[in-house]
Amino acid sequence: MEDKNGAPHGAPHSDSPLGFSHAAPEEDTPAPELAPEAPEPPEEPRLGVLTVTDTTPDSMRLSWSVAQGPFDSFVVQYEDTNGQPQALLVDGDQSKILISGLEPSTPYRFLLYGLHEGKRLGPLSAEGTTGLAPAGQTSEESRPRLSQLSVTDVTTSSLRLNWEAPPGAFDSFLLRFGVPSPSTLEPHPRPLLQRELMVPGTRHSAVLRDLRSGTLYSLTLYGLRGPHKADSIQGTARTLSPVLESPRDLQFSEIRETSAKVNWMPPPSRADSFKVSYQLADGGEPQSVQVDGRARTQKLQFLTVPHSCVH
């Protein structure tokens, strides 16, 4: 018996009911492994808004926000009335600073930079004008004056600043000090990074600590009446450089007619090099030889006979 397609009844069909041949099942092909995506670098912190508030005749308060953080620290920059750039370093957990020692009725423009992992980001800018001078403020000729700014007790990391002022003339003193730009040849020299120290009006000296050795500092002292600047005086001072200690236990060995070996113990502090100088005991032209700082001995040759040599 045949079905309507002509195939014997019961015979298996080679075609599907839809007219397609049955294909052998395909083996599953594993999906290609995708390389893990590189993590996106973290976004840099961003500054928000800088505003000027609490304006007085000689000060302004700057406040700022951080849109995305944190920052390691901040730098506030502005120019004084002499056109000199000034800068103040602020800790990263702070969001405001009082800028004092300004001139009355004077416009100022401030720039705020954020420092993050050695990079300077920004700036934000804001402008403000100091208030009018207080009524009855003394004239330039009659106002009390600071004088005799001097430096004593200088060490590698500190110095004492002294000054003279009329008794009772100032309520307090504001001392600003910082390191000038290392190069005046830069097209845009970096301004002073300053620190501040408040001193009671009854004291006429202050010790500056935690300074860099062998470094020149710019100093500005303000005399304040209340919050207002009455006078200022400027100067500079340099801390001492580290003193290199001398080698010790100098000895001679292997002494010959025209040569000798000199030995020494190095100082506790690191030395880049040593200079061995010698000459005839009864005078004559001094000789010297430069020795690497890691050396502990040096042979002196071509010495004159029969004289001895001294160090």
Swiss-Prot record:
It comes from the Eukaryota. Residues 1-47, 124-150 are annotated as: Disordered. One of its GO terms (cellular component) is extracellular exosome. The keyword Repeat applies. Residues 41-135, 145-249, 250-311 form the Fibronectin type-III domain. PANTHER family: TENASCIN, TENASCIN-X. Gene3D superfamilies: Immunoglobulins. TNX genes are located in the class III HLA region within a complex locus, named RCCX module, containing genes for WHR1/STK19, C4B, CYP21B/CYP21A2 and TNXB. Most chromosomes bear 2 modules, but monomodular and trimodular haplotypes are common in most populations. The bimodular haplotype results from the duplication of the RCCX module, leading to a duplicate containing RP2/RP1 pseudogene, C4A, CYP21A/CYP21A1P and TNXA. Expressed in the adrenal gland. PROSITE patterns: FN3. The lineage of its organism: Eukaryota, Metazoa, Chordata, Craniata, Vertebrata. This is Putative tenascin-XA. Keywords: Repeat. It comes from Homo sapiens (Human).
